[in-house]
């Protein structure tokens, strides 16, 4: 009950534009899947543990990085030393690897945030993902199991903060109205967060 297929999409643009497509039309059983990020992270972890050609060092913290002409040498806090011809820094926005390698980064504010929340819907979504390109941003309704959806509303920073501050009933009405009440009345299931 933590993942659901997308069997169709309806995309709405400005000036009344609309695009619809289905998994059936494209010859596949589903266009994609919506699942909780924690479920995907857990599956990635379990898959990594099953790989015969992968050694996991967990938990571990890096303490020192050195580059030689033929290798990158990474020392862990417990004293373990690792050597490789290629070092990939996939450790997030505030990357320790990037900083230790002396690589500069420029952070540019987007000027908008993604508001995320889950709702119960009065009408069934029938595994349809909806997306609206609006003057105030892009809103997506993503199907979850049962009569539930997850929404992502990419909107300017100030608008996202205002939406997060609304009482649940008002947020439900704003999100339902922005989506043309396509799924009827909404009930907030999780707190709205913006990032």
PLM features per residue range, with description:
Residues 3-100, 108-113, 168:
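Conserved N-terminal helical subregion
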Residues 15, 76-78, 133-136, 145:
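Short loop/turn positions at the edges of beta-strands in beta-sheet-rich folds
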């Amino acid at each position: 009950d933590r993942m659901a297929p997308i069997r169709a999409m309806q995309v709405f643009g400005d000036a009344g534009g609309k695009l619809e497509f289905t998994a059936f039309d494209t010859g596949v059983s589903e266009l994609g899947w919506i699942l909780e990020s924690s479920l995907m992270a857990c599956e990635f972890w379990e898959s990594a543990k099953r790989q015969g050609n992968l050694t996991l060092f967990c938990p571990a913290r890096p303490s020192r990085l050195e580059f030689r002409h033929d290798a990158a040498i990474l020392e862990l806090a417990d004293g373990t030393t690792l050597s490789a011809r290629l070092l990939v820094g996939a450790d997030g926005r505030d990357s320790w690897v990037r900083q230790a390698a002396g690589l500069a980064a420029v952070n540019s504010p987007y000027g908008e945030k993604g508001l995320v929340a889950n709702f119960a819907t009065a009408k069934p979504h029938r595994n349809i993902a909806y997306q609206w390109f609006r003057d105030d941003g892009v809103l997506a309704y993503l199907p979850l199991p049962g009569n539930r959806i997850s929404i992502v509303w990419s909107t300017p920073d100030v608008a996202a903060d205002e939406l997060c501050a609304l009482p649940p009933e008002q947020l439900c009405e704003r999100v339902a109205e922005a989506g043309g009440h396509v799924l009827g009345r909404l009930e907030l299931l999780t707190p709205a967060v913006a990032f």
